[in-house]
Amino acid sequence: MAKQSAKGSTTTKRQRGKRREKKNVPRGQAHIQSTFNNTIVTITDPNGNVVCWSSAGQNGFKGSRKSTPYAAQIAAENAARKAIENGMRQIEVFVKGPGAGREAAIRSLQAAGLQVTAITDVTPIPHNGCRPPKRRRV
């Protein structure tokens, strides 16, 4: 027979972690990582501390639909909405990766009401590093 717990039937409300307070960050950076499979939008303050983030997979897209420009647009809109709630007005955009959602994400950040001050491509280019995946034969 299982032991009875010492607390009995009285239930107490415990707070699960501290509530996230709103940061007031007027300027920031948007890092768009666009791969062949997904698009991740992370919005940070100028020091690189994460304010909010969103991705195509987080917004309910699964499988090959995550890699579409529409999924990247929805992810960027979601991240921009959260950033505006935290008081953000201007952003610099850093784009990384070869994916389909690059331009769509930048456009939807602008459409959501954030002023884009600069767009920089920070895609890493190997100096003959790892062997790339083999070509697909369909």
From Swiss-Prot:
One of its GO terms (cellular component) is ribonucleoprotein complex. GO terms for biological process: translation. GO terms for molecular function: rRNA binding; structural constituent of ribosome. Residues 1-12 have a biased composition (Polar residues). It comes from the Bacteria. It holds the Pfam family Ribosomal_S11. Residues 1-37 are annotated as: Disordered. Keywords: Ribonucleoprotein, Ribosomal protein, RNA-binding, rRNA-binding. Residues 13-22 have a biased composition (Basic residues). Located on the platform of the 30S subunit, it bridges several disparate RNA helices of the 16S rRNA. Forms part of the Shine-Dalgarno cleft in the 70S ribosome. Belongs to the universal ribosomal protein uS11 family. NCBIfam families: PRK05309.1, uS11_bact. HAMAP family: Ribosomal_uS11. Part of the 30S ribosomal subunit. Interacts with proteins S7 and S18. Binds to IF-3. PANTHER family: 40S RIBOSOMAL PROTEIN S14/30S RIBOSOMAL PROTEIN S11. This is Small ribosomal subunit protein uS11. It comes from Roseiflexus castenholzii (strain DSM 13941 / HLO8). The gene is rpsK.
